[in-house]
């Protein structure tokens, strides 16, 4: 999947025919960009301080760092090419990724997120999951939504390590890893109406 995504981005970036040719400036791209090489844990791996690296030799850590940097560089190329394509074509793009001060794009990118949600439970999602959203060729609406929010939070200290079946079945997922990525419909609905749609549009349809 990643190789296909990379190939399509590379083609569009080089001006070759790509899936971006089928997207209109009136459309909106919502990108859930792969975060595994940007999240804050990546800095621990680079420093050789991850719990999994306790018994590694210095040589092993150095070898690992060289390969890890290549992987981070690949993802960094992809996210920049995606944005450049959208800039050139005037396409609207919203991209989400986890939020933390150690996040790679927070420290090493020229474009800042427009919206930061530090606790998604307050808008009806399952987990706290601090998230940042970049808006390109469009601005967040910042509509006010005066509606009660049902509290759907699944209480567990670490959504990956301590989540049991009792927790993850509440999201409709088959395992804890999938559950970590699930979005409660209420959170998605509120996000779209608060930041994406013009207020008059969703009010007239409600």
Annotate each predicted stretch with a short phrase.
Residues 1-206:
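Conserved active-site and SAM-binding loop architecture
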């Amino acid at each position: 999947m990643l190789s296909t995504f990379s190939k399509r981005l590379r083609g569009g970036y080089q001006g070759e025919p790509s899936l971006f040719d089928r997207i209109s400036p009136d459309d909106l791209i919502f990108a859930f960009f792969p975060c595994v090489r940007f999240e804050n844990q990546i800095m621990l791996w680079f420093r050789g301080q991850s719990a999994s690296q306790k018994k590694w030799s210095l040589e092993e850590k150095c070898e690992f760092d060289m390969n890890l940097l290549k992987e981070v560089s690949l993802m960094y190329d992809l996210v920049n090419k995606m944005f450049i394509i959208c800039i050139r074509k005037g396409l609207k793009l919203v991209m989400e990724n986890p939020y933390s001060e150690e996040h790679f794009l927070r420290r090493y990118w020229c474009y800042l997120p427009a919206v930061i949600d530090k606790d998604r439970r307050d808008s009806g999602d399952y987990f706290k999951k601090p998230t940042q959203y970049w808006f390109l060729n469009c601005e967040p609406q910042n509509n006010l939504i005066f509606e009660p929010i049902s509290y759907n939070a699944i209480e567990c200290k670490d959504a990956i390590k301590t989540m049991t079946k009792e927790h993850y079945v509440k999201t409709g997922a088959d395992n804890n890893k999938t559950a970590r990525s699930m979005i409660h419909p209420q959170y998605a609905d509120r996000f779209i109406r608060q930041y994406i749609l013009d207020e008059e549009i969703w009010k007239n349809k409600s």
